[in-house]
Amino acid sequence: MDTSIDEKRLEQIIKFLNSLDINSKRFVEIINQKDKLILHTFNEALTHSSANKIVNYEKLEFFGDAVLRLSASDFIERTYNSMSVGTRSELRSQIVSDEWLTELGKKIFIENVIIKGPKAMGDENSKDTIIAETSEALILSLIHISEPTRPY
């Protein structure tokens, strides 16, 4: 895997990650040491397929969606285990929704660091979807820091 990222993009990613204000020793180490492999994963998470057909967020978004749904299911099971399965499923769909992910992405200004191709840049109809999908990919990248042996 090519882990080369130009210096300007590297600094943009680091500045963005610092803005998240994550207080984790491992996270701070990665940022301070400019761990190229991990930062490449963040670059991938923040790149739309219209900009790069090979290095983009699609795989991370796919796994991110699964991890979020599993985490939400686990939380709901532990917290609201007396609810019917149908009600728990409805609650999960509210917790892990494109609307929530878009709101999260907007709150952290993720759109400022997403690399998009010209077609996606001009497509206002897919703007929120891209923000939601990128947020999922970012979440998985953050999880990858704490569990780097995972296959994603």
Annotate the PLM regions.
Residues 129-143:
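Acidic, Mg2+-coordinating catalytic module of metal-dependent nucleases/exonucleases
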Residues 55-96:
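Active/ligand-binding-proximal structured segments within catalytic/core domains
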Residues 1-55, 104, 108-110:
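Extended, intrinsically disordered, low-complexity regulatory regions
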Residues 144-152:
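Single conserved hydrophobic/aromatic residue that forms the stacking wall/gate
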